[in-house]
Amino acid sequence: MRSVLICGGGVAACCCAHLLRRAGTHSIVEKVDRPRLPAIMLGQTTQKIFEDIFERGDLFEAGHRIQRRVVAWVEGREPVSLPHSAVVLSEEALLDRVEVGPAPNIEDMPGEPEWRIITSHSSAASSAEHHFGGRMAAASPVKLAPAARADSCWIESLPSGWLFLLPCGTDRGWLLAVGGPAQSLLAESHLVVDQLAELGRASGEFPSHPRITDPLGGPGWLRCGSAALGFDPLCGDGVGHAAREAILGSAVIRSVADGGDVDSLIHHYQAGLMAGFRRHLGVCSGFYRAGRRGPWWDEQVNDTLRGLEWTSQRLQTVDAPRYRLKGFALEALG
């Protein structure tokens, strides 16, 4: 295969480019400017995925460590403190660590690319999207209270939304407010509010409900990352999903280059992403059911149930898998 053009510039784009270059495929990233996430928390499983993709065990050595998770979720129950193991860093810092060497220029591409991988939501304007919810979120910089433990994170449900406080240093962090402005939600808070000394200005709102693009691929193109799926930050698995999508997408393109059937490989890719999206909706449904009762919470549950019904209908038409991942490559079954 001569070349692959990757339209994006985030985590999925970097993972796709690296995996394809490792396999000897000429890939070029056409970056799309978009705001970077100020803080992301990666659990041990996601850290291991990145270490395997980029063949580096030192990617997260300098990250801020989270060792405890304090949860006030079920109405009427006391907060629960649970052990945790995660690392916090900004999206920009993560990309700086995984982007090794200067990226090839698009002018260096030998003719038209044989495949395009679209990884940026802003570059997927012609796609049809299915949204399961309408909740908005906003992230605000904060200064932690002196008594707040910087190795902990906090999540709290409230009558019309929820708060997540994530330290990213000894005395600073980010507050994610979902369902309403941070100040309004903090006025009802009994847990998160006590961990704050100062609340900064939010950088703007963004959708926080699950969404999926349809179709996810066709001959000569695939959608990956935010151009394919959108995840609820409640589950904290968006970055890990982006890396997994990149693994599967790059494996599909490699299989096509080796003579595999294009239609069946694209079908496998779409089925894999659809199944992962359904699992995410199931987790969301469990979390929102376990939270509070009231109009806002009932709406979130109904939205996730609608998504589960839609994905069930779509997956009913999916054939049995014809491939499986072995490492970073697909192998045919049977």
Regions found by a protein language model. Name each.
Residues 1-12:
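Beta1/beta-strand and adjacent pyrophosphate-binding region of the FAD-binding site
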Residues 4, 26, 114-116, 222:
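Hydrophobic "anchor" residues on beta-strands that sit immediately upstream
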Residues 7-9, 18-40:
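Glycine-rich FAD pyrophosphate-binding loop
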Residues 9, 100-201, 210-213:
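Predominantly flavin-linked oxidoreductase catalytic cores and closely associated redox partners
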Residues 18, 22, 100, 155, ...:
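Short, well-ordered alpha-helices that flank and scaffold nucleotide-derived cofactor binding pockets
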Residues 45-141:
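Conserved N-terminal helical subregion
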Residues 181-267:
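FAD/FMN-dependent oxidoreductases across multiple families
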Residues 254-334:
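C-terminal helical "tail/cap" subdomain of flavin- and related membrane-associated enzymes
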